[in-house]
Structures are given as structure tokens and as C-alpha cells.
């Protein structure tokens, strides 16, 4: 399911000459395994860390952490992500999308993303992180992933 969304997004990004795409990630039950206690969730699902590290390195992919965690929990997770070499470009907001520009529509209250990783939206972290990892690695090998500077070549 998520691979279909990713491949369609890459195709559309190339077709529309988008210079950035926005990938949103839920935290609990998607990136980390929920523990349902006050100590916090700190165990990553297998391959989640690997995928997020690959995506963090791409300047054309903006990562959004989309979570209902409390502000102090978010700060703690962001510190943990930084130690794990993962960078989120935004937390619970739309990076780089302005309703004032008028070319994307009105996004002051609507969440904007191209790909959504969320267990509540059907993402199965026990299976799909590995699929996404394998896909991204195979794309790197055959150079399928778009060049971050591809728009300058047109």
C-alpha cells in the first residue's frame, strides 16, 4: 500500500517538476512501538530508523513529524532523533506551503503531505518499513530516485 503511494508520488513529482515532496510520519505505532506507559516509547520498528536516515539525506524530501504527543515528549523525541541522525523539517505544521502564495490552495488548517506513514491510515509498520527500505535501496542502486537537482536540468 505505502509503496504504491511512494511510486505514484515520485512519478507525479517528476511530471509536475516539484522540487520538494512532503512525507508525514506519525510517531506512536508507526515509527516507534507503543508501550502505553509513562516511560515513553523508544523502541523503533525494524527498518524505521534505516528508512528515516535515507530520507533525511535527501534535500528534495521534507520530513514532517505529525503526532499528538505532548510538547515535552516531542522535544525528547526530537533529541533522540537527532542522536540517531534523523532530521524532521517540521513538527505538526506544513513546511514551505503558504496559503498566501495562492498557488497550492488554502492550507492554513489542512495538513499538506504527499506521502503519509500512519498506522491509523493503514500503514503496517511490522511489514511496510522493510518494503520501503528494500525499495529505496534498490532505487539507489539503479539510480531511480530523482536527482535532488533534477529541476535545474530542464
Label the model's feature ranges:
Residues 1-154:
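HAD-like aspartate-dependent phosphatase fold
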Amino acid at each position: 500500500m505505502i509503496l504504491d503511494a511512494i511510486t505514484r508520488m515520485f512519478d507525479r513529482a517528476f511530471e509536475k517538476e516539484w522540487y520538494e515532496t512532503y512525507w508525514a510520519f506519525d510517531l506512536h505505532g508507526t515509527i516507534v512501538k507503543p508501550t502505553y506507559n509513562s516511560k515513553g516509547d523508544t523502541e523503533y520498528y525494524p527498518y524505521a530508523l534505516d528508512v528515516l536516515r535515507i530520507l533525511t539525506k535527501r534535500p528534495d524530501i521534507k520530513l514532517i513529524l505529525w503526532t499528538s504527543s505532548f510538547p515535552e515528549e516531542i522535544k525528547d523525541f526530537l533529541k533522540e532523533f537527532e542522536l540517531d541522525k534523523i532530521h524532521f523539517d517540521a513538527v505538526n505544521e506544513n513546511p514551505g506551503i503558504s496559503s498566501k502564495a495562492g498557488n497550492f490552495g488554502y492550507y492554513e488548517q489542512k495538513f499538506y503531505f504527499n506521502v503519509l506513514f500512519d498506522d491509523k491510515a493503514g500503514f503496517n509498520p511490522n511489514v511496510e518499513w522493510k518494503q520501503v527500505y528494500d525499495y529505496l535501496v534498490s532505487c539507489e542502486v539503479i539510480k531511480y530516485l530523482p536527482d535532488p537537482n533534477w529541476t535545474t536540468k530542464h
